[in-house]
Amino acid sequence: MLRLVLLVVVCLSSYSVLGFVRGPAANSFSRRSSLKMMSDLNLAAMPTVEEWLDVADPKLKKATLAMFRACKEIAYKIRTASCDKMACFNEFGDEQLAIDILANNVIFDNLKASGAVATASSEETPTEDPMGGSGYSVAFDPLDGSSVIDTNFAVGTIWGCWPGDKLTGISGRQLKAAGIAVYGPRTTITVALDNLPHSHEFLLVDDFSAMHGQWIKTNEFMSIGEGKLFAPGNLRATQDNPGYQELFQYYMENMYQLRYTGGMVPDVNQIMVKGKGVFMNVNSKKTKSKLRVLYEVAPIAYLIEKAGGLSSEGEKSALDISIDTTEQTSQVAYGSPDEVKRFEKLVGRKYL
């Protein structure tokens, strides 16, 4: 019904505009109006996240929608706050909490309000905290890449949703949903559900259309193929990890394109959007990967594998890592099957 009303409003608006504009301006106005109408019609035809989640368990839908609401609020805070590495300032110049703490609080508040979350844990506060609900438990990194936010680079949020009330003694194989939000020129969330194939992208509509403020499905990621694109994290490890050094040299000799932003969320997101490439963050004798399995490694592995790629900690899928503590870390590679297998062959698990 909502879509029917939107279509009628858009068509009537276009008709009334064209009916009253005359002379040389009419053709130009007509073209602009037609483009606007097509834009609105296309948006109105796309499923909202609420509609898309109708296939999910009711409590999983509530937990997932809580994350979408939180990410919408975080997107607004990022765009309207002036931040440095220590604190943020609102539009009135008042000092606030650092933006990653603000994001942390927003997510906890939304998860508590959902009634569908028993336990939640954040990378900022790596404890298992009761949320007062039941059904699922959520682990999240509230603002991945926050160290580069003052430079206005893209940053993101990562989360995973497990059944039950605990977040240790589990693995990524038990995930029921996972998602990443990208706060860049556009705000998008890519999410995957246990009972649906593929990973699905939603766009936060923030223009002046009738769909303003809604999350609209815009893409579906089904395959990650071969392509010469790589995003190498922890490059210092090439100095004392011969396998990583050899792998990096392979990329250079074969003219791969370097696409590394300093944030794992946008780097992984580009692999799904482009449908090719590989991201890795590797251990060595002196430098260990800081990626936490619960908050980052497992949820992104879930998204990548749902999108048709592979993940690996050097020997096996990152989804098979047993999560024994909230602070457990691991090296990882995500991307096209052949690239991840090359990572396993050259890097392996020697420095795990």
Where in this protein do the model-derived segments appear?
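N-terminal chloroplast transit peptides
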Residues: 1-28
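Intrinsically disordered, low-complexity, compositionally biased regions/tails
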Residues: 23-27, 36, 313
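IMPase-like, lithium-sensitive Mg2+-dependent phosphomonoesterase catalytic core
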Residues: 38-90, 95, 101-352
